[in-house]
Amino acid sequence: MDMAIRMKKAAALILAYCMICLTACGNGGAQGNGTDPADTAGTAGEVGMDSAAENTAETGESTDTDSAAEGAQEASDTAQEPDITDMIPLQVIDDNYRTYYEVFVYSFYDSDGDGIGDLQGLISQLDYINDGDDTTDTDLGCNGIWLMPVNPSPTYHKYDVTDYYDIDAAYGTLEDFKELLAACEERGIKVIMDLVLNHSSSEHPWFVEASSYLKALGDDEPNIEDCPYFDYYHFTKEPASGYEALPGTDWYYEARFWSGMPDLNLDSQALRGEIEDICKYWLDMGVGGFRLDAVKEYYTESIPDNVAFLSWLTDTVKAEKEDAYLVGEAWLDINGFSQYYASGIDSLFNFSFAGAEGLICKTVKGSSTVRYGETIASLDETFGQYNENYIDAPFYTNHDMARSAGYYVGEDAVSQLKMAAAMNLFMNGSAFVYYGEELGMKGSGKDENKRAPMYWSKNADMEGMCDGPADMDAFEMKYESLEEQSKDQYSIYCYYKKAIRIRNQNPEIARGKVEYLSGISNERFCILKKTWEGSEVVLIFHTGAESGELDIAGLTVNGETVTPDHICGSLETGEEKCSIADSVLTMPGYSVLVLK
């Protein structure tokens, strides 16, 4: 690190320290005792989503004068050396390497009091996701939003579309959607829509008309000139696995998921013309791309056919908008989904690291970090052999998976939860965060439980709170709501904010060529060096539960032997900080260090 940067860091630290000592502001003043609130959140602090009675029992109020005096004294008593992360400017690049926030509109924020989240509710909370001001630290810092389906649909989840050109009335109108896009553009947020092309709803006019045609056909042979929509689906008179009987006829139709989701015939040129029009419609409106649902199901058990269709779709979308972003869901192991990169698609969700059985969770729970480090470093070869321009899409959970709060138990649970988040967010590519994961929301079992209302407050009657899916089980949240966590510097929420901020400060994290430093790493310390456009950043993950030391003699970054001056960010789960002295690195349990 050159002298100019070191001087800027020193000046920033001095200024920040003076500001903290002279003011009574700052996160976590009331939690200056160093206790991680998550240690108690699962006991006395654990609350039900409908326990409104508990929420009225707040602490007594004091006068403004008393509060100010106590706050000033508290700030003086708990003033700590400022974190350099707060003083380093962001380097957010307008490309397709982003941090996406997955939003289930139904459960996010209700603007009209009907218990269902809507687009106006999302618009009102955009500043929570990203306020568009790089100088603030009050937002999450995500610069992308993945909208789960918002098209009209008869189901709460809306993965069975009845109109690809409109917005579900429960969510709002096309004008609301256009307002959302404009508000996101002002904040530098790229919006991608869920595009469901494997199937439609059985209530879609295409299927309704095709069904009516077959019911009236009798024993005659179908003619697509009489009913073009017959060719939009797979119909047969022979019963087969994955096919459902069409009531009132002797015909069957393909419906691999369930009878209400008839599979589309993606070989139909007429249907492909419809798909091209649909993509153009939304891209012209300002959508930044699409999340492609169930891409491995397009052609059942045929990777070559799936890749061929994805190639056509990618070319179609890119011809309309060159910088559009496409990410596909191919729920397979790494050797399976990586083959889909041959289509030229930008990204595929990296299922190998996600979920309770994924590599991140296993590593955090005690497996050797060696496999994590070696696998991270090998991804470029694994994916690059199919598409040298690939962009990985790491995620930790999504709407189909149990939420990560349930993965960990015991006294280290909250620390492990945080560590896992960092290991996901510090991977290459476009990282994805499922709404509420930044709060440690619970949700497992049936799908409805995984899509519970965003936990803005303990008070279920608070403005904006959603009711959630009708068939969701009643269960208690494990950790505090946003109301509490936003006031606690050691909360899961604040940890996520800091991790995303570090990611946004160091573009090498998402874009760099990865080298696993096996000679220095060991079972509990994983060291990765990432190089992008001639600049290096070193990431050190310590997955041990207790504080640990590592000899880093010989470790360099940007051509210099590592010293404390090279620290440009760290993630700890409590008050103990990472430090370097005489080539010995000391890191608290479940911590991450960033060097540059």
Annotate the PLM regions.
Residues 202-203, 208-209, 213-238, 314-315, ...:
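Conserved alpha/beta catalytic core and glycan-binding cleft of carbohydrate-active enzymes
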Residues 395-398, 403, 407-549, 557, ...:
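Loop/helix patches that line or flank the sugar-binding groove of alpha-linked glycan CAZymes
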Residues 81-273, 284, 291, 295-343:
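Acidic/aromatic-lined carbohydrate-recognition and catalytic surfaces
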Residues 22-24:
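C-terminal motif of bacterial Sec signal peptides marking the signal peptidase cleavage site
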Residues 578-596:
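C-terminal beta-strand-rich structural cap/linker in extracellular carbohydrate-active enzymes
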Residues 547-572:
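Beta-strand-rich binding/interaction modules
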Residues 2-14:
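Bacterial N-terminal signal peptides that target proteins for export
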Residues 26-35:
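Bacterial lipoprotein signal-peptidase II cleavage site
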